[in-house]
Amino acid sequence: MSLPIVAIIGRPNVGKSTFVNRLAGNQQAIVHDQPGITRDRTYRPAFWRDRDFQVVDTGGLVFNDDSEFLPEIREQANLALAEAKAAIFVVDGQQGPTASDEEIAQWLRQQSVPVILAVNKCESPDQGAIQAAEFWHLGLGEPYPMSAIHGSGTGDLLDALLEYLPAPQEEPEEDEIKVAIVGRPNVGKSSLLNALTGEQRAIVSPISGTTRDAIDMVVERNGQKYRLIDTAGIRRKKNVDYGAEFFGINRAFKAIRRADVVLFVLDVLDGVTEQDLKLAGRIIEDGRAVVLVINKWDAVEKDSYTIYEHREQLMARLYFMDWAEMIFVSAQTGLRVQKILDCVDIAAQEHRRRVTTAVINEVLEEAVSWHSPPTTRQGKQGKIYYGTQVSTQPPAIALFVNDPNRFNDNYRRYIEKQFRKQLGFFGSPIRLFWRGKKVREMEGSRNRATKV
């Protein structure tokens, strides 16, 4: 079960990013430092009380300007709202209501997503109430005064947010497996879709950029339904025309987020390019299960060692995806194409898998016995109290510790490797949230979101 999404909306310079940092704290997903893998963070995990969710900062929203990149931001905001359970509209309490705020409010009132109005930069409780009252006329309900920098007032706002977030048991498991077929232009995605479905639904052409929209096809095998989503090829930004193709790429990114499993298609003749690495980082950031589909295998001269040599070369570049299945296929001849769905079944099952708290703590106990947590220069040692799985799709495990800052990146990677070694989660990324002991102690700061 994936975490519900909360979209953070607002014009530029009202403190949206500061607010997102307040909610997410140190919980940003750990990524590798290989050049080209990471990109600017948009989706970040957050939690309040007993509820986990994701927040997405959509960028500064402006409606009366069509200069470069502003249309993208508006499109990103639309896409975020389409998948969000709720939206938080952030305004500047010190500046007061502006014409841009009113335009955004009018747009939000036309959406079906519930909206919570956050009046930021209210540093004084008494003055904040006065500042917030000026925003009643926007027609979005009660304005909540708060300070993203200091955290005051965020508790009341987040309590209101929880009313719109579904409890985990309210979201039923879906029988259908959603599979996004993604990759650079002209690596054979549409040919692969046609081979899997047996139909010429997508336009197959050697001209890069032929597929502009996300195309859904439903196939059934052995009683299991698969929704296959072909997408526009992901290319470097400098090569993108900010027209139909740009929005096609945005839809491709959205397809990744709505998928259970991503078929990451690579051209064996090209190997792993820099753009492939960036796309791989995007897939991991969105927490999708992955099958690495190496296409055009029919074009390679082979002997008994060729497949092992290519696997080694590819994984040297995609080492951060060493948990994903890699399958060599030919969409043109059909070689091993049907075996792809076997890999999808395994990845989807692992992506949805839930492990008991007892098993998680057995793994932690053994890991700590082999390698104790690090000690700071001041002689203070990290301590892991316990761990528990908080969500699936992807599997996310919260580790409650005395101080997250006492656990360096090396030790965090060690713990993740132990979970991989003992629990598998083959084909799926996993996320570890390191939470301080004080996170659940709300008595001292009931109206303040706590960074950890």
From Swiss-Prot:
This is GTPase Der. HAMAP family: GTPase_Der. One of its GO terms (molecular function) is ATP hydrolysis activity. GTPase that plays an essential role in the late steps of ribosome biogenesis. NCBIfam families: GTPase_EngA, small_GTP. GO terms for biological process: ribosome biogenesis. Associates with the 50S ribosomal subunit. Signal peptide: none annotated. Residues 4-169, 177-352 form the EngA-type G domain. Residues 353-439 form the KH-like domain. CDD domains: EngA1 (cd01894), EngA2 (cd01895). GTP 1 binds at residues 10-17, 57-61, 120-123. Belongs to the TRAFAC class TrmE-Era-EngA-EngB-Septin-like GTPase superfamily. EngA (Der) GTPase family. The keyword ATP-binding does not apply. Keywords: GTP-binding, Nucleotide-binding, Repeat, Ribosome biogenesis.
